[in-house]
């Protein structure tokens, strides 16, 4: 499932983000609660999570049983974990996201996700 759309930041390096958009770069990476996606023509985090959950629900409606592998990116996955754990979606820190190739296993029962194990 797709990552958050980062608007004018798409394709930029971290250095370029901080050079061209220092205030929003600082907010996103160090104070995400004050990040204003509209300032960089990006998808806001709430909309990204809603889009992700819509995709997950579509998959669950098609595949009523068995195992499902979902491959996605760190930011949207971190927001999903916060959603499952009833934490704020803004409790993310880009500097501590799961690494490439990391995974978590969830079960889904009675309309709820439960983390089973991680690597």
Spans of model-derived segments:
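Phosphate-coordination/substrate-recognition cap region in phosphate-metabolizing enzymes
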Residues: 1-26, 95
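Conserved anionic group-binding/transfer micro-motifs
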Residues: 17, 48-49
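Short glycine/proline- and acidic residue-enriched helix-loop micro-motifs
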Residues: 25-47
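Active-site catalytic microenvironments for nucleophilic, acid-base chemistry
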Residues: 58, 62, 83-87
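Generic beta-sheet signal
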Residues: 59, 64-75
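Domain-level recognition of soluble alpha/beta enzyme cores
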Residues: 85-114
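Short, solvent-exposed aromatic-acidic interface loops
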Residues: 116-119
């Amino acid at each position: 499932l797709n990552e958050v759309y980062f608007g004018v930041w798409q394709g930029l390096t971290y250095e370029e983000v901080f050079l061209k958009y220092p205030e929003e770069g600082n907010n996103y990476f160090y104070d995400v609660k004050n990040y204003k996606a509209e300032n960089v023509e990006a998808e806001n985090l709430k909309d990204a999570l809603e889009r992700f959950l819509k995709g997950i629900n579509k998959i669950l409606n098609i595949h009523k049983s068995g195992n499902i592998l979902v491959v996605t990116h760190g930011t949207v996955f971190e927001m999903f974990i916060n959603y499952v754990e009833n934490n704020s979606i803004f409790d993310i820190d880009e500097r501590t996201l799961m690494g490439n190739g990391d995974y978590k296993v969830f079960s889904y029962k009675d309309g709820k996700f439960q983390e089973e194990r991680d690597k």
